Structures are given as C-alpha cells and as structure tokens.
UniProtKB/Swiss-Prot annotation:
This is Anti-sigma F factor. Gene3D superfamilies: Histidine kinase-like ATPase, C-terminal domain (3.30.565.10). GO terms for molecular function: ATP binding; protein serine kinase activity; protein serine/threonine kinase activity; sigma factor antagonist activity. The lineage of its organism: Bacteria, Bacillati, Bacillota, Bacilli, Bacillales. InterPro entries: Anti-sigma-factor_SerPK, Anti-sigma_F, HATPase_C_sf. NCBIfam families: spIIAB. GO terms for biological process: asexual sporulation; negative regulation of DNA-templated transcription; negative regulation of sporulation resulting in formation of a cellular spore; sporulation resulting in formation of a cellular spore. It catalyses: L-seryl-[protein] + ATP = O-phospho-L-seryl-[protein] + ADP + H(+); L-threonyl-[protein] + ATP = O-phospho-L-threonyl-[protein] + ADP + H(+). The gene is spoIIAB. It holds the Pfam family HATPase_c_2. It comes from the Bacteria. Its EC number is 2.7.11.1. Belongs to the anti-sigma-factor family. It is an enzyme of class 2 (transferase).
Amino acid sequence: MRNEMNLQFSALSQNESFARVHRAAFIAQLDPTMEELTEIKTVVSEAVTNAIIHGYEGNAEGIVYISVILEEAMVKLTIRDEGIGIFNLDEARQPLFTTKPELERSGMGFTIMENFMDEVEVISNESFGTTIHLTKYLSNSNALCN
C-alpha cells in the first residue's frame, strides 16, 4: 500500500530536529531496523541543514519542503528548497567540500546521503533552488520498531 506525507516549514535551524523526528515517526509504520531508521533520520538532517544553511543562507523567510512516499519496503524522500541553488554540483558532492568553513561545516552532507541511501539524485538550478530525491530499500526484517 502506498502512503504519502508532505511537510513544509520555515528555514530555521531549530526546525531541523522536528523534520528529522517527524519523518522517522511516519516511516516507522514500515517497521525498519533501528539502523535503517537512524540512517534515514541522519540523511533528513543533512539535507534540511543544507537547505537552511546553503540554500537560503540562513534567511528564515525561506521554506523547506519535504515529502515522503512509502511503498512496501521502500522509502522515497524529497527535500526541496527555493534558495540560491548549487553553483557547482560536482564540487559540492566531493567529500569535505564546504562553502561555509567559517560555520565549521564538515562538507560531508552529500557523502553521508550517498552512503546511507540506495539512490540519490540532486537537481539544482542557480537562483531556483535544489531538490534532492532519496530512496531507501528497507530490509523488511520485522524489526519491531513500531
């Protein structure tokens, strides 16, 4: 059975933890393992933080959009912003690359997403924002997360 949820919120850093927990609660109905759930929460955190810090450059008037689609043992996440976009996507996806070293950013966001998810697609246009599509296939091991 397919189930879908959408969420939008102001681009405030304090909303990142809400987004992470909110998505995890929705995904729990598929009964992921604790490891899978932790990986998804981490990926949501990374993508939302990127949207807030890099996409909107801390402008709280921006809106972050998240959708989740659940189908059988598959989770599809989309995190989108309408910020400044990524100027060099290949460079941004390199481990340890950051445009905000003064904020003590590690530059590992995309690397984490690529390691924790089965599919990662990033679409970005300068001045029009960034959309990240993430897919995770769950082990369906009846982990009793519910």
